[in-house]
Amino acid sequence: MPLPQKKRWESMAKGLVLGALFTSFLLLLYSYAVPPLYTGLASTTPEGAAPCSPAPREPEAPTSANGSAGGCQPRRDIVFMKTHKTASSTLLNILFRFGQKHGLKFAFPNGRNDFDYPAFFARSLVQDYRPGACFNIICNHMRFHYDEVRGLVAPNATFITVLRDPARLFESSFHYFGSVVPFTWKLSGRDKLAEFLQDPDRYYDARGYNAHYLRNLLFFDLGYDSDLDPSSPQVQEHILEVERHFHLVLLQEYFDESLVLLKDLLCWELEDVLYFKLNARRASAVPRLSGELYRRATAWNVLDARLYRHFNASFWRKVEAFGRERMAREVAALRRANERMRRICIDGGRAVDAAAIEDSAMQPWQPLGAKSILGYNLKKSIGQRHAQLCRRMLTPEIQYLMDLGANLWITKLWKFIRDFLRW
């Protein structure tokens, strides 16, 4: 073989070897960053770990935030079970701001922005955890384990979560996470969602890597078997258990009404629940679900559908108890306040594509292989009174976690690799 050609083949061989080694490293890193699915409730927390022992707190001045005659004291011990694709990042921002404003103690994951999801939550996964440690707010993604979470917060902590119409949630999850669910790679048509829903059993394998993202994701996030037989009595038992564990279940479709109920429950002020939509997709990235596809998606996610129906009914009972007219007044007040903040804070008054975001600190996390998540540009001239609040309201989840002191070395390393490879 001529010498130049031999050198070219040697160079190609070295490139292939280096490429194989680098790919292996990425797979190893990803397997560490996204742990395998555990179906049991085995905990990594040592047996007999001491429960939370909160220190006595100085009594606070009562507030009349909710219009009650005697006033009430704001609640500061909160567990937010952060479900996927439910506007939960917007709720997270609300909790981050409240905790930061009042100097509260967050239970953060150690190394990444979730608690080793999809593994079950365990106390030992909390950054700087020590037996007996007590936290005010737990709010990052996890697979819920009530007993483990309960051991980290005060006995009177408020538990909340948020649900979404299961068909809409499935569509969002399918497009956001589909690239990391290998069995979807077999889908070849232009409309992969429609192709999948034509015959989901042909593609779906409950044992497949990241399969949980594409069936009954709410049920899974809440700690239950997402492939449970719909006729099993356990389904209703699990739904009733959720009702016992959570003081309020919010609904994404009625987000403003949900925040009014949350404000009332927690005895917070209106400013505490102001928000901008975070982690939202651009309109062109949201396909329409036709009537037939909607029906198929609902049937495929039947456990989530039963869960949602149950809490949709209980939600409106809470609204009735709150008072329809009072609810309408408070929703209107919230929307006026949000609109005022939009005019004060947001350059151009609306969300923009990732490419149009000028400050890297405002860049939201994007799904693998896409730039579909919108973000914001902060106005350059904001009065001193609102400057801090505006920035906090617009800061994406990952950046806000780092601002609050969370150790995200795995997340940051993964982002560096994605940026380097332009994924």
Swiss-Prot record:
Residues 1-14 are cytoplasmic. Residues 48-70 are annotated as: Disordered. The keyword DNA-binding does not apply. Pfam families: Gal-3-0_sulfotr. Glycans are attached at residues 66, 156, 312. Its EC number is 2.8.2.11. This is Galactosylceramide sulfotransferase. It comes from Bos taurus (Bovine). The gene is GAL3ST1.
